[in-house]
Amino acid sequence: GLNVLRAKMIDKYDLPSFEFSQNYCSFYDLLEKSNLFLQAIIDTRDKPMEDRTVTWLFQHPIGDGGQFTGVSNLIMKYGVVPKAAMPETYQSNNTGQMTMILSLKLREFGLELRGMKASQTAERKVEMLTEIYRILVECLGVPPTEFEWTRCDKDGNPVETRSYTPKSFYDEYIGEDLEHNYVMVMNDPSREYGKVYEIEYDRHVYDGENWLYINLPIERIKEMAIASIKDNTAMYFSCDVGKFLDRTKGTLDVANMDYASLFGTSFTMDKRQRVQTYASGSSHAMTLIAVDLDEAGAPRKWMVENSWGASSGYQGCLIMTDEWFNEYMFRLVVERKYVPQDILDMLNQEPVMLPAWDPMFAPEE
C-alpha cells in the first residue's frame, strides 16, 4: 500500500526519491490489531473455547501481514510520516521475535478476559493495550506527533522546510480518501463470479470495515490493470508468490520447475481445486507497475515491485508470465476511475459473509 502512495508522491512532486516510514505504520498496525483481537475475544467470551471462531482467534492473535483495507484504515486514522521521521529499527526489520512476544501476551490477555465479568472487561482491555503499547515502543520507538521535513526538487535542491503532523502531511501530499476511492477485485474460481464477498475480521482496525471483494473472471481484472498501468498508476497486487518462483532471476513462470518429469507423476488440480484444498491462496502483496503487451494488445508479461530489497529478484522486482498471472494472481486494488460501471454496480449487492478461516483469507506479508 505505501509503495503505491510513494510512486504517486514522487511523480506528483517530481522528487528525486522518497520513502514513507513503514515503521510508523507498523506501530499503529500492531496496536490496532491487538485491540481487534482483544475486543473480538470480549465479543465471543460466551462461546466455548472449542468454538471455531474462538479457536481461530487464539490461533491468529496478531501478525505483521494484512490487506489493503488495513492500510487504508490506518492511514486515514493516523496519517503517514517520511522514513526519516521514524526510521526502521532492528525489530521492525526482523519482526519474528516481536510478533511471538505480542502473540504470547495477547493469548494470555485473551484467557484473562474470558474469565472476567462483562462489566470489568472494557477497563481491563485499556490496561492491556497500555502494556502492548509499551512493548511496541521498546521494539519500534515512539511514533512522532510532529516533525520537520524538507522537500527537494528532482536535482536534490531544498525547496522548503516545514513542520507537519502525520495527518497534515498526508492531507497535503496525498489527500486521497483511501477508504472510498479504491475497489478490491479478486479471482477465485471456486466461487460465483459477479458476486461481492466479505470476510469476517478482514480488517486491522476494530471500528473499521471489512474489505469488500468483487469476484471477477481473470480477463476483466486484466482490463482494469492494463488501463491503470497505461495511465502510470501502480496498484496493490497480491498473489501466491512462492509458486514456481526463481528468486535469483526474479521470475514467476509455471515453466520454471518441471516437477512432473522430475517425480514421474502429474499434478492435475486447477486453480479452483487448489483454492478449495488450501493448496494455493493469496500469500504476498506487492505493487503492480508494468505490463508487456503484444501487437494485439494482449499481455505477455507483468512486473511487480517487491519488498524484499533491491538485491532480490530483478533489481528488486519480479517478472511474471501471463500464464502464471492466470494461475496464481488473486487480488488487485484499483482506483475507481479505472473500474467499468457494470463492475462498480456490483457493489450495490448485499455481500456474502465468509468466515475468517475461509481458504481465501490469509494476511498478506
Model-derived regions, located:
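Active-site nucleophile-adjacent alpha helix/oxyanion-hole segment immediately C-terminal to the catalytic cysteine
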Residues: 1-235, 302-305, 312-315, 322, ...
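Alpha-helix initiation/capping motif
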Residues: 21, 165, 201, 242, ...
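Flexible loop/turn segments at secondary-structure boundaries
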Residues: 33, 243-248, 254-255, 295-296, ...
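Catalytic nucleophile-His microenvironment captured as a short glycine-rich beta-strand/loop
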Residues: 75, 275-309
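Long, positively charged binding patches that form subdomain-scale interaction surfaces
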Residues: 210-283
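Conserved catalytic-core surface of thiol
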Residues: 294-365
